[in-house]
Amino acid sequence: MTTINKNEFLLEMTGISKEFPGVKALDKVNLKVRPHSIHALMGENGAGKSTLLKCLFGIYEKNEGDIVFLGKSINFSSSKEALEAGVSMVHQELNQVLQRTVMDNIWLGRYPTKGFFVDQKKMYEETKKVFEELDIDIDPNVKVATLSVSQMQMLEIAKAFSYDAKIVIMDEPTSSLTEKEVNHLFKIIKKLKEKGCGIVYISHKMEEIFEICDEITILRDGIWVDTRPLEGLTMDQIIGMMVGRELTQRFPEKTNTPKETILAVKNLTALNQPSVNDVSFELRKGEILGIAGLVGAKRTDIVETLFGIRERSSGDIILHGKHLKNKDAHEAINNGFALVTEERRSTGIYSNLDITFNSLVANVEQYKEGFGLLSNRKMKSDTQWVIDAMSVKTPSHKTMIGSLSGGNQQKIIIGRWLLTGPEILMLDEPTRGIDVGAKFEIYQLILELANKDKGIIIISSEMPELLGITDRILVMSNGRAAGIVETKNTTQNEILSLASRYL
C-alpha cells in the first residue's frame, strides 16, 4: 500500500453542508482521517453521519464544503468511483451476490483474464493472497450463501483491501456478531491500520469505541461538535457531546407494578429441533420479562413459536385461562400478541414505502369501508397517532421510512403493533443499532406500556439493558429454560452461570 506520512490526512472533509427541502441536514461539518488510525464517527441517529458519508460517495450532492483525498480535491459521482479510487464502505446491510462464489464477489466486474476467458487459477491465487494478508480463513470457491454474517463482513473488507483502499468505512460492523467473531473482526481491522489504512468506525457500542479507536469525531443535529484523541475521554463526556446534555441515567426509573398472571406458557416445544424444548414461564399484567442467553440459546425461537412463526409440537399457551393455538401470525395477532422482530431492516420495515404504510400494515383490514375501499381519513388519523404517541421525528407521514433514523423506525414499528391493541408485546433486540439518547426514549416507551398493563417480553444481548429495564429474567441455555431470576436480586455472573447450564 502507498506510504503516507502519519501527520498528513488521508481524507479531509471540511465545511460540508447539505440541505433538503425545509431541513438543513449538515451545517459546516468536518471529518479528517489520518493513515494508520481508527477514527470513530459518533452521534445520535439523525445527527448526520449517514448524510455526510453519502456526500462523500456522491449519493448526495453537497451544497458547500470541500473534500480532499490523498491531497487532491475530489467529488465522487458514485460508490463505484469512490471504491476504484480507494474509498470503501462495509455496510450494515451486506451487498453480495449470494449464489456466486467468494472469489467471484471479490473480483466482480474486474475478473483477471487469459485471452477471452476468466483466469480462474489467477483469481483463486489472488484471493488467497488477500486472505492470507488479512488472516481470513475462507475457501474462495464456496458460495457466499453458505457463509456466516461475520464471514460476509470479512469478505467485504477483503474486497476493499483488493482495491488497495486507503479509507475503509465500517457502519455498525458488529451488530450481528458473536463475541468471538467480534474479536476476529477487530484483529482484521488492526491489520488494515498497520498497513496504513484510515478506518472510519461507526458504532453505538461505547465499549467497542474505547477498545479499538484512536480518534473520535462527534456530530449532533447536523453540526460538527468536536474531533479529538479518544485517550482521556470518558463515556459520560462522549454521551454529553452527542446528546447536548448530561445524561444522568441510562434507564428511566422503574414505576410499573406487575399484577396478576395473564400468560402461562407450559412445556413449550417447537416442532423443528434444535429449537425451544420444554420451556415454561408466566408473564404478569404490567410486567417486563427479559429473556437472556448466549448465542444459540434459542431466545428468538420462544417468541417466534408463541407468535405462530414456528410450529409448535407440544406445550400450552394460556392467556387469561384460555388455551390458544396461535397456528400462524394472523391468529396470534387476533389473540392479542404482537412481535417486534430482531432484524428491523429486513423483517420490520418496508424501507421504500412511507410512514403511513409502515404504521398500518399489520392491520389493514380495519381500514376497509364499503366496497372494500380504504378509509383515508382513519388511515391518516391512526398514522398521526403513531407519530405523536411514539414521538417520531419526521417532516411528514408521507416520508419514506428508510430515510429515518433507526430509533424513529423502531418507534414506528412499536406504534404499528400498538394499533392492533395487543395484550402481549414481544420485543426482540429492541434497541439494536440505536443510539444512546433514542435508547432511553424506547425504554421510557416500554415502561409506559407496562404501566398501561401490557405484558412485555424483551429479548436482549445487552446485559445492562436487561438488568436496567426488566422485572424478571428468563435465562435460556441451549433451547431450555435454565432458570428465572428476579432482576433486582440477580447479578450478571448468576445470569451467565445459568446461561451455561445445558451447554
From Swiss-Prot:
The complex is composed of one ATP-binding protein (MglA), two transmembrane proteins (MglC) and a solute-binding protein (MglB). Its EC number is 7.5.2.11. Belongs to the ABC transporter superfamily. Galactose/methyl galactoside importer (TC 3.A.1.2.3) family. It is a peripheral membrane protein. ATP binds at residues 43-50. Residues 11-246, 257-503 form the ABC transporter domain. Part of the ABC transporter complex MglABC involved in galactose/methyl galactoside import. Responsible for energy coupling to the transport system. It comes from Photobacterium profundum (strain SS9). PROSITE patterns: ABC_TRANSPORTER_1, ABC_TRANSPORTER_2, MGLA. Keywords: ATP-binding, Cell inner membrane, Cell membrane, Membrane, Nucleotide-binding, Repeat, Sugar transport, Translocase, Transport. GO terms for molecular function: ATP binding; ATP hydrolysis activity. SUPFAM superfamilies: P-loop containing nucleoside triphosphate hydrolases. The keyword Translocase applies. It catalyses: D-galactose(out) + ATP + H2O = D-galactose(in) + ADP + phosphate + H(+); methyl beta-D-galactoside(out) + ATP + H2O = methyl beta-D-galactoside(in) + ADP + phosphate + H(+). CDD domains: ABC_Carb_Monos_I, ABC_Carb_Monos_II. This is Galactose/methyl galactoside import ATP-binding protein MglA 2. Its main location: membrane. It is found in: Cell inner membrane. GO terms for cellular component: plasma membrane. It is an enzyme of class 7 (translocase).
